[in-house]
Amino acid sequence: MKENDMNNGVDKWVNEEDGRNDHHNNNNNLMKKAMMNNEQIDRTQDIDNAKEMLRKISSESSSRRSSLLNKDSSLVNGNANSGGGTSINGTRGSSKSSNTHFQYASTAYGVRMLSKDISNTKVELDVENLMIVTKLNDVSLYFLTRELVEWVLVHFPRVTVYVDSELKNSKKFAAGELCEDSKCRESRIKYWTKDFIREHDVFFDLVVTLGGDGTVLFVSSIFQRHVPPVMSFSLGSLGFLTNFKFEHFREDLPRIMNHKIKTNLRLRLECTIYRRHRPEVDPNTGKKICVVEKLSTHHILNEVTIDRGPSPFLSMLELYGDGSLMTVAQADGLIAATPTGSTAYSLSAGGSLVCPTVNAIALTPICPHALSFRPIILPESINLKVKVSMKSRAPAWAAFDGKDRIELQKGDFITICASPYAFPTVEASPDEFINSISRQLNWNVREQQKSFTHILSQKNQEKYAHEANKVRNQAEPLEVIRDKYSLEADATKENNNGSDDESDDESVNCEACKLKPSSVPKPSQARFSV
């Protein structure tokens, strides 16, 4: 019933949007208001669906819970009849408190199991509208895009390919010639724009990127609400987010489009900027009223950075968590990063690596004045607020995934929380995160220690072996050396009568090798390997 209501709501929203597009200029404000209302409805429906799934999980274990509660009640009643003790609240035989706590613990366990099931769920894609995002400042990728589009048009007749509108008049891409070569209609090649994506974010079934990590971040910036699954081919300078090789696209694309796939729902952060205006005086009460204006909201995949910008002074930033003041940071800035962004700016500033499947917020200071201000990992449920202190000497600057840089005056603040719109990426392999940090960062890569004899010439190796055998033959067994050392040391101690003298010699004469105890070959010295 709820799924039908949600589908009807989506269809209604699409129809309303299509009707408004014809009168966009006249009804712009009305459309924005409707989109905000529908966004709130979508969030409510998502929460209701999650609650319904939790109810199903709880109902599956209701019989087991009832049996345990009945058993506990019988034990409590038995103790009460035999003159046993009372419960915590002073009443005999009451299991209300334990029942409530048991339900609470069961719900928490159900949430963890639900999260685990979602992370392991495989989704079957019915791809009809394929979107291709190309790194436009690399000319060589124009031809690779052409090759990919031609192959898809030939092998997937039901698929309509959408490419960047910048390629429409490109001679390198040559859409008309491409349709002739693939023997398909020109209507199967269409072009997407940012405005089209903002209005139809659920239109595409799969996004394929040709570029590097910056191309993936660009996809996140244009899909500010729902994001289709993203399959990224590594054709850039970095490769933390691009785990597919382009030379294997003929094998990987059919597997993704024809079979069930596993996606990683990467956490994004919802960042909202608020501008503080000068306080106004209420004419009735005479009190000052602080006016705050909401400027914009960004859903980011990597990090939000609040720094001092061109100012030579340190930033003074007040950090709040769930409404409580956590600390006042005097530093070059602060970084609030997602697990995906933990390998970017946050890592360079000394932050920790975080697996993308862990939902958390990595807070990393940039060159803090206090060395005790260390990076910290916070839960995704926390609501952060970073405010430019009124005592700050200069304004601050904020950037979202390195873009949309904006100046923050004294009193301005940014709220940071987990975004309801995750960023799904197609999983190439279960260990792709470890492979990426090992490949890009040389994580825990070290040279194996080599044997000393490997760098010796043949002549010196023979001399070394001869000397090793000579020392081995002269050395007495370790047990004999220990006995001699202990006996002679006791004799020397008796002769000294417990007094220290400059003439005392702590060395022990060894009849076999005439060496001091410190020169007696140790087991590691006596057993040579050539």
Swiss-Prot record:
One of its GO terms (molecular function) is NAD+ kinase activity. The modification Phosphoserine is found at residues 499, 503. Residues 88-99 have a biased composition (Polar residues). Residues 499-508 have a biased composition (Acidic residues). GO terms for cellular component: cytoplasm; nucleus. SUPFAM superfamilies: NAD kinase/diacylglycerol kinase-like (SSF111331). Residues 1-27, 57-99, 486-530 are annotated as: Disordered. Coiled coil: none annotated. Residues 59-75 have a biased composition (Low complexity). It comes from the Eukaryota. It catalyses: NAD(+) + ATP = ADP + NADP(+) + H(+). Optimum pH is 8.0. Residues 13-25 have a biased composition (Basic and acidic residues). One of its GO terms (biological process) is intracellular iron ion homeostasis. Pfam families: NAD_kinase, NAD_kinase_C. Its EC number is 2.7.1.23. Keywords: ATP-binding, Kinase, NAD, NADP, Nucleotide-binding, Phosphoprotein, Transferase. Belongs to the NAD kinase family. Homohexamer. Present with 5040 molecules/cell in log phase SD medium. Specifically phosphorylates NAD in the presence of ATP, dATP, or CTP as phosphoryl donors. This is NAD(+) kinase. It comes from Saccharomyces cerevisiae (strain ATCC 204508 / S288c) (Baker's yeast).
